[in-house]
Design a protein with these regions (language model features):
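Flavin-dependent oxidoreductase catalytic core characteristic
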Residues: 1-152
Length: 152
């Protein structure tokens, strides 16, 4: 028996193709998002380069050994987010420094930086939404959301 539209294989084949198309679209969007950000930085619309330099300069300085106050909700997570943003800026700066305008041709580099950007967005969105709901609805009703945001 050859290929037949009535067999279960037809829907499995179609679903596999749809998944590949969907994944391809995700890959393209990841490249477009970071590519647009870098283009805006090169044109001077977004101050990415000087921020990356500031992060690089702060790393060469003497670190603070002062323990932060972690008494409020998500204080520790916000410190982690701040450090993730520094990593993102360092990688963008290093990539732009190494490749210059040709960074758009370095898809693997762009995809990795884009993944970090997406993770930062997701983590920050979860924290901000949970904080908003925590203030609006109270502590008891948001225990699950707080735990999920802290876990993320």
């Amino acid at each position: 028996m050859g290929y037949s539209k009535e067999t279960p294989m037809e829907s499995a084949w179609r679903d596999a193709r749809i998944a590949r198309i969907y994944e391809g679209t995700n890959e393209i969007n990841r490249l477009v998002a970071i590519g647009m950000l870098i283009k805006k930085a090169i044109k001077g619309h977004v101050d990415l380069i000087s921020e990356a330099e500031n992060v690089a300069n702060s790393l060469t300085g003497i670190p603070s050994f002062e323990l932060p106050d972690l008494s409020d909700l998500f204080d520790e997570e916000k410190i982690i987010l701040k450090n993730l943003k520094k990593i993102f800026l360092m990688l963008c700066g290093a990539g732009m420094k190494k490749f210059g305008l040709d960074i758009e041709k370095e898809q693997e580099v762009l995809l990795s930086i884009s993944d970090i950007m997406i993770e930062i967005y997701l983590a920050e969105s979860a924290i901000l939404r949970t904080e908003k709901n925590f203030k609006k609805f109270g502590k008891n009703s948001q225990e699950g959301q707080v735990s999920m945001s802290q876990l993320y």
